[in-house]
Swiss-Prot record:
Catalytic machinery residues: D376 (proton donor)
Official protein name in the record: Squalene--hopene cyclase
Temperature behavior of the protein's activity: Optimum temperature is 60 degrees Celsius.
Source organism (scientific name): Alicyclobacillus acidocaldarius subsp. acidocaldarius (strain ATCC 27009 / DSM 446 / BCRC 14685 / JCM 5260 / KCTC 1825 / NBRC 15652 / NCIMB 11725 / NRRL B-14509 / 104-IA) (Bacillus acidocaldarius)
Principal location: membrane
Length: 631
């Protein structure tokens, strides 16, 4: 006990510096927004998009060249995340982009990349999206790319493989690509930029299949679709294209994107190009909107964000600052709260297909994406608003009520919550040959469900309410044998376990329950010698990495919050975790985090949330201070 009292000034000073740093990051309008890092396919595909749309800015291309070379590793490859293994798809796309920009295959960075690509079987070993981009520029035959025809738009909402069986991100992508694949356009590369060398390999291709395994039925279906494509007459094709086009035009976001994410946005612009609609307001808005997602880098590079996270970052920052002790009516928090109120969505989106009678009230991840609010953001924002006092208290309460009711209405039949849709659990999309990329459905997840419960707990609800009781039962069913919980949207078991234990405590579950104690033991068993916690993105594919990896500030914070919620704030493990955050804090009050701790698609796409390294340690230290001072 005496030792902890000695440490108190250190963690308190660390928390004070963290608060000051977070406040310094707030934008004048009241929100927080950190760049969202991913991998270089974003920039490589941007280069090819500019070629296809005939809108190449040479200064921008040079900045992208600098960025791509900056991100290239010593062995000549690119990875999906820092410290990750070489990734063939990413390396192929970066190579093609660099050659288009003007680099020769004989330059050393290109030679290194080429040797790796050839050693893996070349283009034929790559994913569908990579081969599709190469088909668009004439470097791969369209007939070898799995087909998604626009006639998919005719499948009714109750029919297998209709577009609403796909997750929201895949749905918009499929609709846009259906138009592109219908026309199978080719925008040839200039002769100097062509890449026949990517076929120069004696290594057999190692192509992976669909996420769920294609199976002969789905392979036969794809062959049939290609056969149909070759016919001279497609009686319903034009009507299908019009339906797909109308669907896209109806769902363009206010910022010009589609879904607030890169893939459907790029493909929608290509679709509009091949439909000769480059003067259409939707195309102009979409093209101009790309600038918001670009980031100028201090060394002269330029990167493109897969998405942007201002609402998410702001909600988390408010929660962190309130936990750290800022008053509910602090002027900076009032400004943030009022900014969040303006982001509430009051029109139906795709979610209403499954919930037509549910009134809107959710929040989206981005600045302006009204058709795709998500449960995770809504839970965090409603929870954050519940910690504030604003000048217009009636408006705050009304917003919370709408958001709360929307979340309740989005509960899936198994008791959990998905991110964007209810019961988006069909397995069929995972078997389509086209779907060899990431997740294509949006089933309930442990971490989203946990954030909902912690939100509800902040209002005083507990498991006497059936909605919460069903969610708790869902979480108990999903617990892994070792005591941990999976993290769908954060890496990985540390994220899931930290969220779930905190949630169970928030809704009044006795943390002395054996299954919760097992989770806490798992957390303590995975602490690193330096006192922190870390988990490698490889844990999604190799169980040996579960809870293991170099320590990071955000993952240490998640582990600490589990221990604090579970009644172990005064444990040696918690003390050492806090000490890690104290010792690794920068002089300016922030933290460095070289590894990604966010997840887009497990096994396929990872994210570096640049605000996580600051908001989560602040939140954890604030909770630690409260727990220690209550003893």
């Amino acid at each position: 006990m005496a030792e902890q009292l000695v440490e108190a000034p250190a963690y308190a000073r660390t928390l004070d510096r963290a608060v000051e740093y977070l406040l310094s990051c707030q934008k004048d309008e009241g929100y927080w927004w950190g760049p969202l890092l991913s991998n270089v396919t974003m920039e490589a595909e941007y280069v090819l998009l500019c070629h296809i749309l005939d809108r190449v800015d040479r200064d921008r291309m040079e900045k992208i060249r600098r960025y791509l070379l900056h991100e290239q590793r010593e062995d000549g490859t690119w990875a999906l995340y820092p410290g990750g293994p070489p990734d063939l798809d990413t390396t192929i796309e970066a190579y093609v982009a660099l050659k288009y920009i003007g680099m020769s295959r004989d330059e050393e960075p290109m030679q290194k990349a080429l040797r790796f690509i050839q050693s893996q079987g070349g283009i034929e070993s790559s994913r569908v999206f990579t081969r599709m981009w190469l088909a668009l520029v004439g470097e791969y035959p369209w007939e070898k790319v799995p087909m998604v025809p626009p006639e998919i738009m005719f499948l009714g909402k109750r029919m297998p493989l209709n577009i609403y069986e796909f997750g929201s991100w895949a749905r918009a992508t499929v609709v846009a690509l259906s138009i592109v694949m219908s026309r199978q356009p080719v925008f040839p590369l200039p002769e100097r930029a062509r890449v026949p060398e990517l076929y120069e390999t004696d290594v057999p291709p190692r192509r992976r299949g669909a996420k769920g395994g294609g199976g002969w039925i789905f392979d036969a279906l794809d062959r049939a679709l290609h056969g149909y494509q070759k016919l001279s007459v497609h009686p319903f094709r034009r009507a299908a294209e019009i339906r797909a086009l109308d669907w896209l035009l109806e769902r363009q976001a206010g910022d010009g994107s589609w879904g607030g994410i890169q893939p459907p946005w790029f493909y929608a612009l290509i679709a509009l190009k091949i439909l000769d609609m480059t003067q259409h307001p939707a195309f102009i808005k979409g093209w101009e909107g790309l600038e918001l997602y670009g980031v100028e880098l201090d060394y002269g590079g330029w990167m493109f964000q897969a998405s942007i996270s201002p609402v998410w970052d702001t909600g988390l920052a408010v929660l962190a600052l309130r936990a750290a002790g800022l008053p509910a009516d602090h002027d900076r928090l009032v400004k943030a709260g009022e900014w969040l109120l303006d982001r509430q969505i009051t029109v139906p989106g795709d979610w209403a297909v499954k919930r037509p009678n549910l009134k809107p009230g959710g929040f989206a991840f981005q600045f302006d994406n009204v058709y795709y609010p998500d449960v995770d953001d809504t839970a965090v924002v409603v929870w954050a608003l519940n910690t504030l006092r604003l000048p217009d208290e009636r408006r705050r309460r009304d917003a919370m009520t709408k958001g709360f009711r929307w979340i309740v209405g989005m509960q899936s039949s198994n008791g959990g919550w998905g991110a964007y849709d209810v019961d988006n659990t069909s397995d069929l999309p995972n078997h389509i040959p086209f779907c060899d990329f990431g997740e294509v459905t949006d089933p309930p997840s442990e971490d989203v469900t946990a954030h909902v419960l912690e939100c509800f707990g902040s209002f005083g609800y507990d498991d006497a309410w059936k909605v919460i009781r069903r969610a708790v039962e869902y979480l108990k069913r999903e617990q892994k044998p070792d005591g941990s919980w999976f993290g769908r949207w954060g890496v990985n078991y540390l994220y899931g376990t930290g969220a779930v234990v905190s949630a169970l405590k928030a809704v009044g579950i006795d943390t002395r329950e054996p299954y919760i104690q097992k989770a806490l033991d798992w957390v303590e068993q995975h602490q690193n010698p330096d006192g922190g916690w870390g988990e490698d993105c490889r844990s999604y594919e190799d169980p040996a990495y579960a809870g293991k990896g170099a320590s990071t500030p955000s993952q240490t914070a998640w582990a600490l919050m589990a221990l604090i919620a579970g009644g172990r704030a005064e444990s040696e493990a918690a003390r050492r975790g806090v000490q890690y955050l104290v010792e690794t804090q920068r002089p300016d009050g922030g933290w460095d985090e070289p590894y990604y701790t966010g997840t887009g698609f497990p096994g396929d796409f990872y994210l570096g949330y640049t605000m996580y390294r600051h908001v989560f340690p602040t939140l954890a230290l604030g909770r630690y201070k409260q727990a220690i001072e209550r003893r």
